[in-house]
Amino acid sequence: MIRVSVVGAKGRMGSHVVEAVRAADDTELALALDAGDDLTQITPQNTDVVVEFTVPAVSLNNVLTLVRQGVNVVVGTTGWTDEKLDQVRAALAETETIDGRKQSVFIAPNFAISAVLADVFARIAAPYFESAEVIELHHPDKVDAPSGTAIHTAHAIADARKAAGLGEMPDNTQTDDGSRGAVIDGVHVHAVRLRGLNAHEEVLLGNAGEQLVIRADSFDRISFMPGVLLAVRKVDSGEFPGLTVGLDQFLDL
């Protein structure tokens, strides 16, 4: 059995993770911690993998603490920048092995299989279209915008276009006033916050006379749980030492 501790266990996502860990045949709940709890309770003696779902303001410090504690970590909190990822890599470089295996941290912009596949499809399609934009739609309680998933998708589109030798996208906008959204690596990203939504993303790709729309919808947070459990199993396997970003790294694509 994989011993799993959950940090952020009382949150919207964390509570679902607790239930999923208890329900799975190959995982058991070790500790369920939330804001104010001491993370040094988590050690290799009681935990194989920690799942961290908190908020961007504290997630980096949580992960660095857990790395120092010597445990493997699966992170679902968004708001990760290249600078923060570099801090995690540096912390991992200073750690010792766990039972002869190098410590692992996994960070996912999204755990929904549909969203991960949509990102992959967008990367494949991007070189074949002149224009591409991303729209992400979430509930109004989400604290970050644009979403980590949308940022990840925008970078994937930009990388695919650069690899194909494409230049800038056509855009003759003269006045903006913020209506064109954020620009991530040259890709416009628009964020919608609306009561009744959960987590949704559209990628719009256009050529003269045609359009391709790639859309992923997560209507319930339960849709993230298969991805979370997959990440827990992969991290525990020891096959992915160091830092891994993106659930697509664990899929046979």
Swiss-Prot record:
Q: Which top-level group of life is the source organism from? A: Bacteria
The record places the active site at 138, 142
Binding of (S)-2,3,4,5-tetrahydrodipicolinate, residues: 139, 148-149
User: What keywords are assigned to this protein?
Assistant: Amino-acid biosynthesis, Cytoplasm, Diaminopimelate biosynthesis, Lysine biosynthesis, NAD, NADP, Oxidoreductase
Location(s), subcellular: Cytoplasm
User: What pathway is this protein a component of?
Assistant: Amino-acid biosynthesis; L-lysine biosynthesis via DAP pathway; (S)-tetrahydrodipicolinate from L-aspartate: step 4/4
| Residue ranges crossing the lipid bilayer per the database entry | none
The processes (GO biological process) annotated in the record are: diaminopimelate biosynthetic process; lysine biosynthetic process via diaminopimelate
- PROSITE patterns (alphabetical): DAPB
Reported EC number(s) for this entry are 1.17.1.8
Q: What class of enzyme is it?
A: oxidoreductase
Broad class of where this protein is predominantly found:
cytoplasm
Q: Name one GO cellular component term.
A: cytosol
Pfam families membership: DapB_C, DapB_N
Q: Which residues bind NAD(+)?
A: 8-13, 34, 76-78, 108-111
Q: Give the protein's function.
A: Catalyzes the conversion of 4-hydroxy-tetrahydrodipicolinate (HTPA) to tetrahydrodipicolinate.
Return the similarity comment: Belongs to the DapB family.
Q: Which NCBIfam families match?
A: dapB
Record HAMAP family:
DapB (MF_00102)
> Could you identify this protein by its name?
4-hydroxy-tetrahydrodipicolinate reductase
Organism this protein belongs to: Bifidobacterium animalis subsp. lactis (strain AD011)
From the broadest rank down, the organism's phylogenetic lineage runs: Bacteria, Bacillati, Actinomycetota, Actinomycetes, Bifidobacteriales
